[in-house]
């Protein structure tokens, strides 16, 4: 299969590309810079120059592919609404190019989009009002237009070497503050998945998933945030403390809105229906390997 991949040079995308190539697929990766293009060529992929802000270009690339994996997202924490709108336009453009073809379009979302405070499953509709909800709904709706569209919801912590997501930010904050913190009793849970396992799931969804389905890239149902704070405190040799919810923004900055989220997530249906078998280390074990603190 000739697969167009957006976000192909990102943390997850740079694992998805070799996963696809290793399974016999051809990859065309989206690159907006010379460095990105060089990285894709080195990985054995073709290059399509463009960006998420060019929906017409994305449509051309999708039209020339047998399938699409959409990983790119504008991670602008100052303007989530604008980032979500850009994502929606990209999905609509690529979906229109694939309409009536029954070709696969795999769209990325997050497990935190599901209702909070109970075990989330693949059948849960997204909670209203999040910046990714319109994108996920648009992707699932493409099934009615003859696109084999599906959604992969990534755990909040996709971890592994080179991670630059939430956990490295928690480590940075702990270094700056001289203490490793959690909110309240720290019992709220974040699911996790190793980068290599997430990449394998994207391939399986591309190859197998029926139209209009959602899948969960979550190896662990939920790691208590207090456990993360404790392992960070141990490695940095700083005290582990509780921060009241009303001080979350003051202590964690932009992460304050996420640090208290309780997002336990099941991937039972994903494993059963797609044969996904995560093999990477868990989040705490990955932290204990030490590379996050180099």
Locations of regions flagged by a protein language model:
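N-terminal Rossmann NAD(P)H-binding glycine-rich loop of SDR-like oxidoreductase domains
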Residues: 3-23
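Conserved Rossmann-fold NAD(P)-dependent oxidoreductase catalytic core, especially the SDR/UDP-sugar
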Residues: 26-28, 74, 86-130, 150
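NAD(P)H-binding glycine-rich loop region in Rossmannoid oxidoreductase-like domains
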Residues: 29-92
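Glycine/proline-rich active-site loop of Rossmann-fold NAD(P)-dependent oxidoreductases
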Residues: 133, 159-169, 176-177, 204-215, ...
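Conserved beta-loop-beta element that borders a ligand/cofactor-binding pocket
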Residues: 137-161, 166
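A conserved pocket-lining segment of Rossmann-fold NAD(P)-dependent short-chain dehydrogenase/reductase
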Residues: 172-193
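Mid/C-terminal beta-alpha module of Rossmann-like enzyme folds, strongest
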Residues: 199-255
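Amphipathic terminal alpha-helices
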Residues: 281-294
């Amino acid at each position: 299969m000739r697969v167009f991949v957006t976000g192909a040079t990102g943390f997850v995308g740079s694992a998805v590309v070799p996963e696809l190539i290793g399974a016999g697929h051809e990859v065309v990766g989206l690159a907006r810079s010379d460095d990105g293009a060089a990285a894709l060529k080195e990985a054995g992929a073709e290059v399509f120059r463009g960006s998420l802000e060019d929906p017409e270009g994305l449509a051309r690339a999708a039209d020339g592919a047998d399938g699409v994996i959409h990983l790119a997202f504008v991670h602008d924490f100052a303007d989530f609404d604008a980032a979500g709108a850009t994502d929606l336009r990209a999905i609509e453009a690529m979906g229109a190019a694939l309409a009536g073809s029954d070709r696969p379009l795999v769209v990325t979302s997050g497990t935190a989009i599901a209702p909070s405070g109970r075990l989330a499953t693949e059948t849960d509709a997204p909670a209203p009002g999040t910046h990714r909800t319109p994108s996920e709904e648009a992707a699932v709706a493409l099934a009615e237009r003859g696109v084999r569209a599906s959604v992969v919801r990534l755990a909040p912590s996709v971890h592994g070497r080179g991670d630059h997501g939430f956990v490295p930010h928690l480590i940075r904050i702990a270094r700056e503050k001289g203490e490793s913190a959690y909110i309240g009793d720290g019992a709220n849970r974040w699911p996790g998945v190793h980068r290599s396992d997430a990449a394998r799931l994207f391939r399986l969804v591309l190859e197998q998933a029926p139209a209009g389905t959602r899948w969960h890239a979550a190896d662990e149902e939920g790691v208590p945030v207090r456990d993360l704070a404790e392992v960070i405190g141990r490695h940095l040799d700083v005290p582990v403390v509780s921060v009241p919810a009303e001080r979350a923004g003051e202590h964690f900055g932009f992460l304050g809105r996420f640090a208290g989220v309780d997002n336990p997530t099941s991937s039972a249906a994903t494993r059963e229906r797609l044969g996904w078998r995560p093999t990477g280390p868990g989040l705490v074990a990955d932290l204990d390997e030490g590379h996050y603190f180099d």
